[in-house]
From Swiss-Prot:
One cellular-component annotation, GO: cytoplasm
InterPro entries: GrpE, GrpE_coiled_coil, GrpE_head
Organism: Lactococcus lactis subsp. cremoris (strain MG1363)
Region of interest called Disordered, as start-end residue ranges on this chain: 1-20
GO MF entry, a single one: protein-folding chaperone binding
UniProt-listed PANTHER family: GRPE PROTEIN, GRPE PROTEIN HOMOLOG, MITOCHONDRIAL
Function, in words: Participates actively in the response to hyperosmotic and heat shock by preventing the aggregation of stress-denatured proteins, in association with DnaK and GrpE. It is the nucleotide exchange factor for DnaK and may function as a thermosensor. Unfolded proteins bind initially to DnaJ; upon interaction with the DnaJ-bound protein, DnaK hydrolyzes its bound ATP, resulting in the formation of a stable complex. GrpE releases ADP from DnaK; ATP binding to DnaK triggers the release of the substrate protein, thus completing the reaction cycle.
Name this protein carries in UniProt: Protein GrpE
Annotated gene: grpE
Family membership noted in the UniProt record: Belongs to the GrpE family.
Quaternary structure (record): Homodimer.
HAMAP family on file: GrpE
PROSITE patterns: GRPE
């Protein structure tokens, strides 16, 4: 072999080694870039998944709140009408307490009163309890000293009846309380 051929073979081997080194370095760089891109894509996917889950949960909450509000509207739909009818019911009660009514008039007023009370009960309106004073249901308009017959925090007299629609207070009872 000639000197030139030996030199060429040597150069080729060096070129192959350099190419091999470059190729390995280039491959490592490419792999590293791909790994970085993959990491970024995974971070982005995780971020979007979290956003999706938050939005999905928020939508479920909005739907749940909407359903609850609709149920509350249906449950308390007659609240305003009931409040207006209560004053008429009070007037009927006062009219029935008047002396000198004929039996027919009294019977007619009682029938109207009973039909109003029945209609209110059908809608869920109930008279509040008068067993003992409850500041959530009663308004104390007067206090009297407690005695054997009326212990402390008991209701002595009811000036105006109180009513509630389901568990919501429509009107507190005006009462006299023993202290």
């Amino acid at each position: 072999m000639s000197e030139e051929t030996k030199e060429e073979i040597k150069n080729e081997k060096v070129d192959e080694e350099v190419t091999e080194e470059l190729t390995e370095e280039a491959l490592e760089d490419i792999v590293e870039e791909e790994i970085n891109e993959l990491d970024e894509a995974q971070k982005l996917a995780t971020e979007w998944e979290n956003k999706f889950l938050r939005v999905s949960a928020e939508m479920q909450n909005v739907q749940r709140r909407g359903n609850e509000e609709r149920l509350q509207l249906v449950k308390y739909r007659s609240q305003d009408l009931a409040k207006k009818i209560l004053s008429s019911l009070d007037n009927l009660e006062r009219a029935l307490a008047v002396e000198g009514l004929t039996d027919d008039v009294k019977k007619g007023l009682e029938m109207v009163q009973e039909s109003l009370i029945s209609a209110l009960k059908e809608e869920g309106v109930e008279e509040v309890s008068y067993e003992s004073f409850d500041h959530n249901l009663h308004m104390a308009v007067q206090t009297v000293p407690a005695d054997d017959e009326h212990p402390a925090d008991s209701i002595v007299q009811v000036f105006q009846k109180g009513y509630q629609l389901h568990e919501r207070l429509l009107r507190p009872a005006m009462v006299v309380v023993a202290q």
